[in-house]
């Protein structure tokens, strides 16, 4: 354990990110989002009115001072690759800044896909080694949060760790979806179990478990050595949570980093914000929260901007229809290029180029880009996928049986509508 003075912290906050490379695991399918990920990887799913989910991990890197990034892709990667090429191509390679796209290399005979999260890094080791980084930050590309990775890097160095795992308490009934750990008084991880059926509780709070967030910092040389050993192990599933972290824990070289120490928040008294929007309800709820009066996630912090591809679009427009009814919204996010004509939009999120025609009522809905809503529609508690054409007079979210017959309806009553579902009902999707 190394004790650092305040000036040392400031120096390390500048230096450590420059000595690091971030690898963002962005190949996940996200099957729990159902048809929303049929044609795009989960990190490429739209979020918050104008962003993609991966923009949060990428923006965290830039804001933390990390300007060398590799995005590891796999499932349905075209949309993700296109987004990064369009929105994240401003780096200066002469200044050693870049975002590298790293698809599956098929280096294992007979293997076309990554065998696990660790194998996704292993297959790109020859490229990653060329970065000559001292530290490697491993990130998931499908979570919504704001974090200063420089604080986690300082914690890693100060504790003398070879591997540091970001963690946060979660309700014990939800902990089976995470890696769960126990730590000593110095935050050394003394036990780690991946997705246990009966998760252990925290000693000071029986209602919570200490969960891994899938965010890791490694000494680079140590990581490369581990990955090569794991690659030779025929009994390994080649996964960080299932194989590598338990092995490092057993060797006594893994430390925990409490997320509140590096979470970026405008309100220091607020609960640290981190969301896995992996289910339809979680995705819908996280989007709608941004439209609330005081959202849990501050998207207006000029000191920690979330960057994305910005298409040149006109401002949103609210107009009256021919009968004189005004287009109006309340507690909603409405992006550029939208036109609301003589309709009411309440507690909803409308992405770019959405058109809502006259006499509609939109309530608690998420409408992805280029959705076209015909006249006299009522949409409630739903997610409408990109470029859907909702026919005149359609009602969604008011009749559970009808919704389940026509579309996908979750157990919580959130309805997902896609172009393919509408086509099967005989509704043309071309305008």
Curated annotation (Swiss-Prot):
Alpha-D-glucose 1-phosphate binds at residues 114, 179, 194-195, 212. The record marks 74, 113 as: Could play a key role in the communication between the regulatory and the substrate sites. AMP binds at residues 40, 46, 52, 130, 370, 386. Allosterically activated by fructose-1,6-bisphosphate (F16BP) and inhibited by AMP. It comes from the Bacteria. Keywords: Allosteric enzyme, ATP-binding, Carbohydrate metabolism, Glycogen biosynthesis, Glycogen metabolism, Nucleotide-binding, Nucleotidyltransferase, Transferase. Beta-D-fructose 1,6-bisphosphate binds at residues 39, 419-423, 429-431. It is an enzyme of class 2 (transferase). Pathway: Glycan biosynthesis; glycogen biosynthesis. One of its GO terms (biological process) is glycogen biosynthetic process. Pfam families: Hexapep_GlmU, NTP_transferase. Its EC number is 2.7.7.27. GO terms for molecular function: ATP binding; glucose-1-phosphate adenylyltransferase activity. It catalyses: alpha-D-glucose 1-phosphate + ATP + H(+) = ADP-alpha-D-glucose + diphosphate. Homotetramer. PANTHER family: GLUCOSE-1-PHOSPHATE ADENYLYLTRANSFERASE, GLUCOSE-1-PHOSPHATE ADENYLYLTRANSFERASE-RELATED. Involved in the biosynthesis of ADP-glucose, a building block required for the elongation reactions to produce glycogen. Catalyzes the reaction between ATP and alpha-D-glucose 1-phosphate (G1P) to produce pyrophosphate and ADP-Glc. NCBIfam families: glgC, PRK00725.1, PRK00844.1. Belongs to the bacterial/plant glucose-1-phosphate adenylyltransferase family. This is Glucose-1-phosphate adenylyltransferase. It comes from Escherichia coli O127:H6 (strain E2348/69 / EPEC). The lineage of its organism: Bacteria, Pseudomonadati, Pseudomonadota, Gammaproteobacteria, Enterobacterales. The gene is glgC.
């Amino acid at each position: 354990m190394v004790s650092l003075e305040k000036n040392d912290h400031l120096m390390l906050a500048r230096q450590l990110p420059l000595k690091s490379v971030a690898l963002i695991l962005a190949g996940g399918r996200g099957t729990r989002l159902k048809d929303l990920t049929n044609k795009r990887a989960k990190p490429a799913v739209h979020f918050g009115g104008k962003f993609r989910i991966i923009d949060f991990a990428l923006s965290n890197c830039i804001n933390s001072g990390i300007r060398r990034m590799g995005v590891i892709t796999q499932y349905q990667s075209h949309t993700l690759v296109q987004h990064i090429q369009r929105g994240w191509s401003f780096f200066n390679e002469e200044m050693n800044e870049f975002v590298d796209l790293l698809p599956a290399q098929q280096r294992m005979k007979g293997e076309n896909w990554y065998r696990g999260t660790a194998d996704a890094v292993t297959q790109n080791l020859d490229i990653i080694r060329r970065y000559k980084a001292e530290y490697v930050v491993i990130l998931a590309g499908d979570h919504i949060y704001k974090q200063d990775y420089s604080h986690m890097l300082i914690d890693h160095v100060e504790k003398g760790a070879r591997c540091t795992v970001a963690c946060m308490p979660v309700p014990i009934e939800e902990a089976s979806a995470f890696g769960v750990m126990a730590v000593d008084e110095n935050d050394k991880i003394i036990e780690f179990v991946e997705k246990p059926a009966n998760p252990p509780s925290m000693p000071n709070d029986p209602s919570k478990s200490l969960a891994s967030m899938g965010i890791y910092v490694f000494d680079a040389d140590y990581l490369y050595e581990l990955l090569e050993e794991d690659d030779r192990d025929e009994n390994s599933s080649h996964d960080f949570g299932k194989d590598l972290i338990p092995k490092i824990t057993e060797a006594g070289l893994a430390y925990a980093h409490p997320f509140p120490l590096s979470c970026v928040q405008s309100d220091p008294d607020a609960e640290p914000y981190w969301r896995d929007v992996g289910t339809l309800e979680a995705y819908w709820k996280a989007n709608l929260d941004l439209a609330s009066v005081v959202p849990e996630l501050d998207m207006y912090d000029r000191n920690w901007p979330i960057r994305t591809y910005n298409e040149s679009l006109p401002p949103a427009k609210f107009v009256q229809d021919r009968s004189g009814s005004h287009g109006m919204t309340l507690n909603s996010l409405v992006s550029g290029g939208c036109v609301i004509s003589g309709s009411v939009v309440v507690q909803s999120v409308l992405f770019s180029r959405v058109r809502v025609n006259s006499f509609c009522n939109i309530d608690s809905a998420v409408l992805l880009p280029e959705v076209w809503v015909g006249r006299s529609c009522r949409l409630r508690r739903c997610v409408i996928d990109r470029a859907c054409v909702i026919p005149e007079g359609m009602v969604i979210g008011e009749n559970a049986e009808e919704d389940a017959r026509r579309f996908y309806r979750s157990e919580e009553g959130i309805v997902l509508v896609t172009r393919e579902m509408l086509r099967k009902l005989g509704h043309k999707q071309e305008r």
